[in-house]
Amino acid sequence: MKNVKLIAFDLDGTLTQHKEPLTEENRCVLEALAQRYQLLMVGAGQTRRIFRQLGEFPIDIIGNYGLQYARYDAQTQDLQVMRDLQLPCDRDSVEQRVTQLRGRFGWETYAGENVEYHPSGCVTFPVLGTKAVQQDKLSFDPDRKKRRAVYEQVVAAFPEYHVFVGGSSSFDMAPKPYNKYHALDEYCRELGITHEQVVYVGDDYGPGGNDESVYLSDITFITVDDYRTFGEKMAPLLAD
C-alpha cells in the first residue's frame, strides 16, 4: 500500500484474544510494522490497561474512545498521559432509562449493580449485572443476536451517547462525540496526517461494533476476524 504513514489498531479480537496478553507472534509483526510506519492503538478501555495487555509494547495509545490519550516515552519506556478527560454523567437519568429497558426486554434479573459508571463519563449497561458469573456472560449472547435485535431501541433511549454492543453481554456507551472515528480523526488532524495516509485494523466492524464508525468512514479498513490471522492480514503492508 502506497503513501501509508499511520496504522491504527483495535486490541481485543484483532491483536489478541479478548483480555489476553499479546502473543509473541503478533508482537513480532508489530515490531516489523514499526520499522516502516507510525503505529497507534485506538481502544475502548483505559490506556494503562491496554499498555499492560500489550506487554508494554512501545506505542501511542488512545483510550476510552478518545477521552484518554497517552504517548509512549522512549526514555522512560512508559506512557506519558497527555489527556484524561472525565465528563459528568446524569446517573439518575441513566439508571431510570436502563431500568425501563430491562422491563421492556425482560432483563429484570441481574447480579450486582444495574449500571456500571466509569470515571471517564463512559457507561456500561451490563445485561446480567455488574457481578454476573463469567460463564453466564460468555454464554448469554455469543453471536450478539439478542443485543443487536434491540440495539436501535437502546440507541434511541440514549441520544447523548454513542452506543456499542460491547463484550459478551453488555452495551457500552461513550458521551458524544467520542467514538473511535472521532478519536482517530482528531489524532490525524493534530499531526497533519490525512485520512488517505491511514490504515485502520479491527474486528468489531459489524452493526453496533465499536470499530464500525471507522469502517463506515473514508479511512482504509483492514478486517481481522481472527487475531491468529493478524500477521497474514498485515503481509501486504510489509511487502517490498
Predicted features by range, described:
Residues 3-20, 184, 211:
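Asp-based phosphoryl-transfer active-site loop
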Residues 104, 109-199, 207-210, 217:
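Conserved acidic, metal-coordinating active-site core of Asp-based
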Residues 191-195, 208-240:
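Asp-based, Mg2+/Mn2+-dependent phosphohydrolase catalytic module
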Residues 20-112:
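Active-site phosphate-binding/coordination module
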Residues 43-44, 201-205:
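Glycine-rich beta-to-alpha transition loops that act as phosphate-gripper elements at the mouths
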Residues 1-9, 25-28, 32, 240:
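Non-catalytic pre-domain segments flanking phosphatase-related domains
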Residues 7-9, 61, 200-201:
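Residue-level marker for buried hydrophobic side chains located in beta-strands
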